[in-house]
Amino acid sequence: MGCVVSKSDDIKNENESRQRNQASSSQQPSSSQTPSKQIGIAAKDSEEQPQEVSYSQMRELDNDFFKDIIDRTAQKFIDVSMVGPDGKDSFLDREKDYSAQIKDSKLLKPTSLTSLPRLSQQCQMSNLQNLLSQPTTFDNELMSKYTSSISENLNGIHIKECGELVVFFGNSLK
């Protein structure tokens, strides 16, 4: 690059590459932005030319698509308000059984839920890391207080009838 001949060769090569780039870009149509596609509609292979759609039309098409989803979902709901008196009796029996099961289940060792690990017999208290990793007395008291509070609240749960709960498991949006 230090001599005059190589500098003129460099300029010549730049001009040639610039001309090639301009020729190739003039042959290819340039598009600065890709067209928008509607949500939920798969692109067809036969569509080579993108359809020009205004923003408001795209918004209306998307709203129609979402409205269709909502309508199909509404058709799949189960109306439990039409349950006859026979269904209500079985519901009351199930509610009583469930309530009795919860009342009968007691937490025998509430501290085992949130207890912290203990030092094994093999660990020596002279080991500073093991000594410092032990919980403080305040932490132990705090954890036991919260554990007993949680245990009391769980054992005192009262269940009242609120109605049937229906959950549909399946492909409801297909």
Curated annotation (Swiss-Prot):
Residues 7-19 have a biased composition (Basic and acidic residues). A lipid is attached at residue 2 (N-myristoyl glycine). Keywords: Lipoprotein, Myristate. Residues 20-38 have a biased composition (Low complexity). GO terms for cellular component: autophagosome; lipid droplet; Ragulator complex. One of its GO terms (biological process) is cellular response to amino acid stimulus. It comes from the Eukaryota. This is Uncharacterized protein DDB_G0292160. It comes from Dictyostelium discoideum (Social amoeba).
